[in-house]
Amino acid sequence: MSDYKNYLANQVMMGKMNRREFIGRTVAAGVALSSASTLFATSAEAQEPKKGGHLKLGLEGGSATDSKDPGKNLSQVTFVSSHNWGDLLVESDPFTGAPVPSLAESWEPSKDAVTWTFKIRSGVKFHNGKDLTVDDVVATLKRHSDEKSESGALGVMKSIKDIKADGGNLVVTLNEGNADMPLLLSAYHLVIQPNGGLDDPEAGIGTGPYKMMSWEPGVRATYEKFPEYWRTDRGFVDSVEIIVMNDATARMAALSSGQVHFINRVDPKTVGMLKRAPNVEILSTSGRGHYVFIMHCNTAPFDNNDLRLALKYAMDRETMVKKILGGYGKVGNDFPINSTYALFPEGIEQRSYDPDKAAFHYKKSGHDGSVLLRTSEVAFPGAVDAAVLYQESAKKAGINIEVKREPGDGYWTNVWNVQPFSTSYWGGRPTQDQMYSTAYLSTADWNDTRFKRPDFDKLLLQARSELDEAKRKELYHAMAMMVRDEGGVILPMFNDFVNASSKKVKGYVHDIGNDMSNGYVATRVWLDA
């Protein structure tokens, strides 16, 4: 609750929220009316964010193969980078997940939620001096709808039938009604680029608070404040530097010694040590992120569902949460949705570690010999240790898992979504529809388990157009059961996003949407020194 109040207070300080809105949202969150009024008065008098300074981020996840094309954002580094230099049409509220305006300042659906009209913000400039127009928006969305783009948003864009300009408005027509449609446009790949990025998707030119000055994939990137940025509540520092630090020990040392202001992916095992550092603050956020072991359902031996079930029952989830997450997370149930999502399908039995059931399904599968699991320290914090733990728990069921540690550099292009059994992570998505459309729809480019089921696709489309919430929830329940019992994902844990910063860093927003303040860490914080 304190994080939410701090966030609302910052909105008041920056003139983004009036008294009525502030009190309404704090009362809705369970704060008494009298207390909300006092909080508003205090917030209005609070210190404004400080401007200036050079912000340094030490980030894990960078690779020599990183791309500046937002459609190909694969790593933590490119995720933050595109938020530095670019904007989306729609964002999600960091605490509720509801859609909030960005480059689209308002929207209106048709009665059947099939056609949506978005008013595009005027007076916005790209870093190259060009004014933002609705044509840039149309071109961007069409590029990400093209199979050749290899965009991570392609699964989401397949629900769109037509995209066109109407004066200063964007008109989007869907294949079927979807009440969640605005949140589809908050997919982090859909950064608006001049002419949609068709001229050069790697240009790194957008409308964001920082202009990209240099880019060395897998090494570093630098940005300078864009003086004509259209928002007043973002972009407080003068410049930003991302330094790729894939080694967890090096990141921790860099933060402790003051070489950087912020690091991501703090290993839970080192949190206690970092807490003892006098100038360090731990930033832990619960959300929709999850760590996974992914099997390709169309590749032997994982095309046998009994083998997949054996490997699911061979996972000791409680031990994973305790030893890998250090308690910074919760047990998963082999489908990618948790209770932070609207219409969460309750009542699904929690899958537990069961060596006997694992042995039963393993024998039934007819598989003989070891199973090769590829992993790397960049897959998620503690991924290599998690693979070894999994190897040990599976051994008790008579299953031999061979663990192969792969190099971090190139993991996201050479192993993930390529090899048939590997470790990975997902940051979650704003809605169930978007999560399933991105990673489980048969035609999605990022269907990393090769779960291709026409009956599942049909349920997804039915749920998308179903406006009755009770019926929609039933459909999501059926989809979750199908993924859980027949899919290729082993999801042992939903992770908290554990990062750390210098105490000089102020204004950090804990965002349920995704890691590192949903990618906006550099644009939301300021330096108090």
Feature locations, PLM:
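N-terminal secretory signal peptides
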Residues: 1-21, 42
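Surface-exposed binding/hinge segments that line
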Residues: 119, 152-195
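Ligand-site clamp/hinge motif
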Residues: 228-273, 391-392, 400
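Structural transition elements
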Residues: 330-363, 380-385
